Amino acid sequence: MRQNNLIAKINQEQLRDDVPEFRAGDTVRVHARIVEGSRERIQLFEGVVIKRKGAGIQATYTVRKISNGVGVERIFPLHSPRVAKIDVIRQGRVRRAKLYYLRELNGKAARIPERRRN
């Protein structure tokens, strides 16, 4: 077996099949596993997906939320075992793949309208 095929096969085995379909503009709740000493707990991070990047095992997504008036962004690997689950709260209607402009907006201007489901 060639090395490229072997790497592709190993990567294919590591992909998660429980990842919901979401895209930039959607509001998601990420259940992240946090290890503190010998304890492991679940930490929730809810915000707007401002970008998705990459494909396959190296795919990532960035979630932005406002915490105490300060914008916080976290980058999560899509297929990471450290992410317990991803809940899609609402689907946003945007016309861009990367929503970096949200960093400059605040208050009501930073809201994203909900995408209508047919």
UniProtKB/Swiss-Prot annotation:
Q: Which GO terms describe its molecular function?
A: structural constituent of ribosome
Would you say which domain of life the source belongs to? Bacteria
Keyword Ribosomal protein tagged = yes
Q: Where is the signal peptide?
A: none
Query: What Gene Ontology terms describe where this protein resides (cellular component)?
Result: cytosolic large ribosomal subunit
- Asked whether the UniProt record includes Ribonucleoprotein among its keywords, one would answer yes
Q: Which BP terms does GO give this entry?
A: translation
Q: Which family does it belong to?
A: Belongs to the bacterial ribosomal protein bL19 family.
PANTHER family registered for this protein in UniProt:
LARGE RIBOSOMAL SUBUNIT PROTEIN BL19M, RIBOSOMAL PROTEIN L19
HAMAP family noted in UniProt: Ribosomal_bL19
- Role according to the record: This protein is located at the 30S-50S ribosomal subunit interface and may play a role in the structure and function of the aminoacyl-tRNA binding site.
Task: List the protein's name.
Answer: Large ribosomal subunit protein bL19
- Higher taxonomy: Bacteria, Bacillati, Bacillota, Bacilli, Lactobacillales
